Amino acid sequence: MAKSVREKIKLVSSAGTGHFYTTSKNKRTQTTKLEFKKYDPVVRQHVIYKEAKIK
């Protein structure tokens, strides 16, 4: 069975609320850490979400 190229990651809110999104990324093409501006429902604002590993 072939090893998956995509890696599951967690996007953690920089607002410190503990809210996160899960997604996947291609390990070969995306070598840098991902950063997105997404909606945080806890603070009701768009904040920066940074990549973290799923434990």
From Swiss-Prot:
A GO molecular function assigned to this protein is:
structural constituent of ribosome
Biological process annotations from GO:
translation
Query: What InterPro entries does the record tag this protein with?
Result: Ribosomal_bL33, Ribosomal_bL33_CS, Ribosomal_bL33_sf, Ribosomal_zn-bd
UniProt keywords, alphabetically? Ribonucleoprotein, Ribosomal protein
GO terms for cellular component: cytosolic large ribosomal subunit
Query: Which Pfam families does the record cross-reference, listed alphabetically?
Result: Ribosomal_L33
Is Ribonucleoprotein among this UniProt entry's keywords? Answer: yes
Q: Which domain of life is it from?
A: Bacteria
Sequence similarity = Belongs to the bacterial ribosomal protein bL33 family.
PANTHER family reported for this sequence: 54S RIBOSOMAL PROTEIN L39, MITOCHONDRIAL, LARGE RIBOSOMAL SUBUNIT PROTEIN BL33M
The record, for NCBIfam families, names: PRK00595.1, rpmG_bact
Which protein is depicted?
A: Large ribosomal subunit protein bL33
Q: Which gene encodes it?
A: rpmG
